[in-house]
């Protein structure tokens, strides 16, 4: 299939002039690179931030604001984040996080943290936000790998997973995808009559796709 791994851009997205969506080959290049794995020891904050950006679609500031008490486990054993700091009302949500990430080392990373301070080291700087340092390092990461196709930034990871969940034949239905991504539901009928998914229901829908992404990048311990 010639279109496999390509971004499924709508006309609206193409004409918006916004950030581009990573293609699958670029994602594999980023997350299989030697530089990426070096960061697990050298800069674990960056390592886990971009990995979480890939599988949760969270915005930078949503991730950098997460505290230890926002990392939860449901009654059914599903792991998730409670997002309390987002730019929209729909962005305040509970997000499934694949258990594989915790097994991969993220749990040990969290266990070292104390109190209610953010689990990541990034702090707000006047006018720049806490994600500025992440964005700059991610730009250097792309430059190192010679990934220079237009406007590819950290937010492009969010666009990638949203696009991945939209696959025509095997994607996630509109309502749970909007809830996961923190998007407003545009259809008045759907928004009025849809009941919000519980975190366990949402995890059951989303986790298989997150696990598939982890498989595509061949995450190694």
Language model regions located:
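Conserved tyrosine-mediated DNA breakage-rejoining catalytic core shared by Y-recombinases
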Residues: 4-10, 65-105
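Catalytic-site neighborhood detector that most strongly recognizes the C-terminal catalytic loop/helix
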Residues: 87-89, 181-217
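Short, charged phosphate-coordinating catalytic segments
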Residues: 1-2, 53-77, 174-176
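Active-site/catalytic core of tyrosine-dependent DNA strand-transfer enzymes
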Residues: 98-149
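C-terminal catalytic core of tyrosine-transesterase DNA break-rejoin enzymes
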Residues: 48-51, 55, 62, 137, ...
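Exposed loop/turn and edge beta-strand positions of beta-sandwich/beta-sheet ligand-binding modules
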Residues: 46, 77, 91, 148, ...
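Basic, Lys/Arg- and aromatic-enriched nucleic-acid-binding interface segment
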Residues: 2-60
């Amino acid at each position: 299939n010639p279109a496999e791994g390509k971004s499924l851009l709508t006309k609206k997205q193409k004409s918006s002039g916004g950030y581009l969506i990573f293609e699958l080959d670029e994602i594999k290049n980023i997350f299989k690179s030697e530089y990426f794995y070096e960061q697990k020891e050298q800069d674990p904050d960056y390592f886990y931030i971009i990995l979480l950006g890939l599988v949760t679609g969270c915005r930078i500031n949503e991730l950098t604001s997460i505290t230890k008490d926002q990392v939860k486990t449901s009654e059914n054993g599903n792991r998730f984040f409670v997002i309390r700091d987002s730019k929209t009302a729909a962005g305040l949500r509970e997000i499934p996080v694949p258990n594989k990430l915790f097994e991969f080392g993220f749990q040990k990373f969290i266990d070292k943290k104390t109190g209610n301070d953010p689990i990541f080291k990034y702090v707000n700087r006047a006018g720049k936000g806490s994600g500025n340092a992440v964005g700059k390092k991610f730009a250097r990461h792309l430059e190192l790998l010679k990934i220079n196709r237009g406007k590819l930034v950290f937010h492009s990871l969010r666009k990638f997973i949203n696009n991945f969940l939209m696959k025509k034949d095997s994607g996630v239905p509109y309502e749970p995808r909007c809830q996961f991504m923190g998007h407003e539901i545009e259809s008045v009928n759907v928004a009025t009559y849809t009941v919000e998914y519980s975190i366990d229901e949402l995890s059951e829908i989303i986790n298989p796709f997150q696990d598939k992404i982890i498989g595509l990048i061949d995450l190694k311990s």
